[in-house]
Amino acid sequence: MSRQLYLDCDGVLADFDKGAQAILGLPPRAFEKRHGLGRFWAKLASAPDFYFSLPLMPDAMELYDAVKHLNPVILTGLPRGNWAADQKVRWAAQHFPGVRIITTMAKDKRNHAKSGDVLVDDQVRHRDRWEEIGGVFIQHRSAAESIEALKAYFPL
């Protein structure tokens, strides 16, 4: 079976929480709880090049180096509005030149997969939607754990 490997961006390759905390002055979940989701996204959207300026996750290159021979695709969810896609595409080009990136609403990630495809993602919210189409979902906690889990599906 031919499988495609998809890597989520925020929380797997890009350190969303670190970048967001620098803008918000609080950890993202704390800011959202205190000020609401609308203000959370409005503040990030108004920050110049928020997504483009995100740092790499500390172990992002460890994960990527282990799977680059599989030609992974970055499959990343977008917030509402039309402000983030270009920033994410430029971020991927800077950190992972030549790697294909697909930007979509998180709930629609499964529309880009076929049965057997593997997604490494830190957010389990849409796990069921991915698995409904026959995809394999690996919850990312660290590069080491994800690499170990991927060995069941790919030669690493």
Model segments located where?
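Acidic, Mg2+-coordinating phosphoryl-transfer loop and its flanking beta/alpha structural elements
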Residues: V118-K151
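A short, structured active-site edge motif that brings together acidic residues
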Residues: V73-W83, V89, H95-H112
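Conserved Lys-Pro-Asp/Glu-containing loop-to-beta segment of HAD-superfamily phosphomonoesterases
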Residues: Q4, T103-W130
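Short, acidic loop-to-helix structural element flanking the phosphoryl-transfer center
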Residues: E32, S46-I74, G81-D86
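Short, structured coil segments at secondary-structure junctions
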Residues: K68, P97, S115, E132-G134
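Active-site neighborhood of HAD-like aspartate-dependent phosphohydrolases
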Residues: M1-A45, E132
